[in-house]
Structure formats: C-alpha cells, structure tokens
Regions:
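Residue(s) in the substrate-gating loop at a strand-loop-helix junction
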Residues: 106
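Short C-terminal tail/terminal secondary-structure segment
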Residues: 111, 200-228
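Active-site helix of classical SDR
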Residues: 86, 122, 130
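Conserved mid-core segment of classical short-chain dehydrogenase/reductases
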Residues: 32, 55-72, 95, 115-118, ...
C-alpha cells in the first residue's frame, strides 16, 4: 500500500479527499469488501474503475503449449475481477440514480498473437462484458465503457519491455512518441465525468494509432521505392 498511500496523501494535501485500501483482485470477497468499505467511508459510490490485469509470459504461450493453470488464473484476474467489480458496484449506483463504470481492457483483445493466448482472450471478454453491462443498466442511468491501452510507458514497461520492442512499437505508431500513464488517466477521467454522459458501451483505444496501419505497408513502400 506504500505507493497508494503516497498518492492518497498527495490528493489530500491538494484539497481532495482520498484513502488507500487493500485489494486482492483474485478474491471476490476482497473486491466486495473494498466497495463496501468505500461506501461506508464516503456514503455512496458514483464511479468505479476496474483497472487490473496481467499475465505470466513464461506460462501464457500458444494454445497447445500454454499452462492450463495460467489460463484459469488469467481469466480469474483479468475478467472475473471486472465482473465482480461491476456486480458489487451496480446496486450502490442504482441507489444513487446512476453512475459510471470504466473497465480496462487491452489492444490485445482485438489482435491475434503468437503468444499471450490467455491475456488476449480474457481481455476480449472485458470488451464484451462492458457492452452487456451498458445494455442491461443504461435505463437506470448507469454507463459502462472500456479503455484499451496500447504500449504505455509505465514503470513496468520501462523496466521490463525490451528496448527493441519499444523501438518497434514506436516505429509503427502513427504518432511520433510512446503513450504515458496520464494518457490513460485523462481518458478514464473523461469517461467518469458528465462530459461523456451520452457515451456508453464503447471501448476507447488509446494506442497512438499503432494498429491503424496496414501490416503490408512497409513492404509496399519498399517495393515502390525499388521501382523508382
């Protein structure tokens, strides 16, 4: 909780109100306790950001060779936690007359890969779950949207993503720079606010235009240059 406490302290010093609370996203009781504790502390719940995810690269391989235990653990972490976050938050939002739910998915939800079968499949489930929640509770003024980050320069990415992969992502981004954590934070803030009150069931891709490129484009450009 050290980093969370530091963030909460900074918010409080700047005139806001914040508390840091423990959560084990693999345990539904922990998720429920977090939401109940939040309501007990602040009186109500208007917004929830289900922001959790991850995988074990050594075990999350192709469909034949991946670890089956990692498949179940990955789904428990990446989508079950989101489902329970929605499930336990919605009744409180119903009492308030509405609310906003933001789920973090990933661009891996939309693209096949040679590895990370569990991660991509479970994050794809988050996209679908987001639409279902939006459809089921929209008439009660509860919105549900998702954010799909590309490669974002979080501390984990800075320290663990190989430099050649960072350079590769940058090469194929439509924009000339990497994404930063604030790019995700501002998107979530928009979806949490009334400025997005007519948006629901959507997944906002925050990925610098990396995936809009035609994968054959580099070869086509090289071919065209060779013909000159």
């Amino acid at each position: 909780l050290e980093q969370a406490n530091a963030v909460a302290e900074k918010i409080n010093k700047n005139g806001g109100t914040a508390s840091a609370m423990f959560l084990n996203a693999l345990e539904k009781e922990s998720i429920k306790n977090l939401i109940d504790q939040t309501v007990q502390t602040y009186g109500k719940l208007d917004i929830i950001h289900n922001n959790v995810g991850g995988t074990n690269p050594q075990a999350d391989l192709d469909i034949v060779n991946m670890d089956e235990k990692e498949w179940h653990r990955g789904f428990q972490l990446n989508i079950d936690s989101v489902m329970y976050g929605c499930r336990y938050a919605i009744p409180h939002m119903q009492k308030n007359g509405g609310g906003s739910i933001i789920n973090t998915t990933s661009m891996a939800a939309f693209n096949g890969d040679f590895m990370r079968t569990t991660y991509g499949s479970s994050k794809a489930g988050v996209v679908s779950l987001t639409r279902y929640v939006a459809a089921q509770y929209g008439k009660q003024n509860i919105r549900c949207n998702a954010v799909a980050p590309g490669l974002i320069m979080t501390p984990a990415a800075i320290h663990h993503v190989p430099d050649f992969m960072k350079e590769l992502f940058l090469k194929f981004n439509a924009l000339p720079y990497h994404g930063e954590p604030n790019d995700i934070a501002y998107t979530v803030l928009f979806l949490a606010s009334d400025e997005s009150k007519f948006i629901t069931g959507q997944t906002i891709e925050v990925e610098g235009g990396h995936y809009i490129n035609n994968p054959t484009a580099p070869d086509m450009v090289a071919f065209a240059q060779a013909q000159q």
